[in-house]
Amino acid sequence: ASKCTIMTEAEWLNPKTGFNKANNSWMWYLPQSTEGIANLVNFAAWRSSEATWGYGGKYVFEGVTSNFYNEISDTDWRKRAFVGPDAKYADYSDITNLTAAQFANLPAYANLKFHPAEGETATYSVGNVTDIPMMRVEEMYLIEAEATAHADASAGLQLLKTFMAKRDPEFSTSAVSSADVVEEIIWNKRIELWGEGVVFYDFKRLNYSLKTGYVGTNVPSD
């Protein structure tokens, strides 16, 4: 049996090691070394909003849609991994390596999930040497919950509740039918595995749609 354990809040939001260093949750990952590290063609340079040498921390600032952010429960601590529209530095200073001045340049909804190695925000030869997550045990729990829900909605929901007890102490849902429970599971899978290249395939498999055109959207039409 796997000895992997679900990431804790402290591990998830750690500004020095969060999603840049393999831990007991990671079942499979891609390690990088200092040999051959480039400044731009690199995971952290694109994904991290703190990599000030890269596109991710200078121009792109990868993040979520406003609709996505607003749908995350305020009691779900994973929401802190994304910069709120009314964000104040004091509310994020414990989970970011940026200074107050640098933080002020982040657009709303930018991610603070992926950090440069060692929390290094200026030197690419250090900050780009991260481990890249490929498969985490959390995905396995959510796959089990979905598979169960297709056959038994109540049992699948219970598995989700057990998982969510480690993410949102006040988690609740009105989902009852198998279809609705599966949708709730996939929604939390979207939050949990954002930026890890997983849920796109769930959307294709389940024939889900993604809406980006709505009043208040932060997705440009062009």
What are these regions, as identified by a protein language model?
Residues 62-66:
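Residue-level signal for threonine
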Residues 1-44, 53, 59, 69-222:
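Acidic/polar-rich alpha-helix caps and helix-coil junctions
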